């Protein structure tokens, strides 16, 4: 997040980080896109998803999304990947998600990010 913010000359919070979690089984992955300064609140995650927050290993992230950690893209993901956007992003007009590699990003309005990510819904799972 810090390096991306420096490269783009924006505050770190505007970097939209995509976090990868285990879904209900081995064939499903949950992506949560948050503001760069946000942290997952385990209690809120458990309440919303009805399961414990379990982040994927770097190997499983690459297998599930096709991207390495640091470059996970919130859009154009394979079947079985469900994407949610955290409300921590909504304080910004535009944010910068990764585009599939650790050295790529695109500036998007939050409504564009929601649409392009085929997001299921806005959620509140961060501190």
Language-model features: where?
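Extended, low-hydrophobicity, polar/charged segments
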Residues: 1-127
């Amino acid at each position: 997040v810090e390096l991306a913010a420096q490269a783009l000359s924006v505050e770190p919070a505007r970097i939209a980080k995509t976090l990868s979690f285990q879904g209900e089984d081995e064939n499903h992955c949950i992506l949560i896109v948050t503001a760069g300064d946000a942290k997952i609140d385990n209690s809120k995650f458990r309440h919303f998803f009805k399961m414990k927050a379990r982040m994927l290993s770097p190997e499983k992230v690459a297998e599930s999304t096709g991207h390495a950690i640091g470059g996970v893209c919130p859009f154009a993901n394979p079947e079985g990947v469900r994407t949610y956007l955290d409300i921590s992003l909504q304080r910004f007009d535009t944010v910068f998600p990764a585009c599939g590699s650790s050295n790529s990003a695109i500036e998007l309005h939050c409504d564009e990010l929601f649409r392009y990510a085929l997001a299921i819904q806005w959620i509140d799972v961060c501190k």
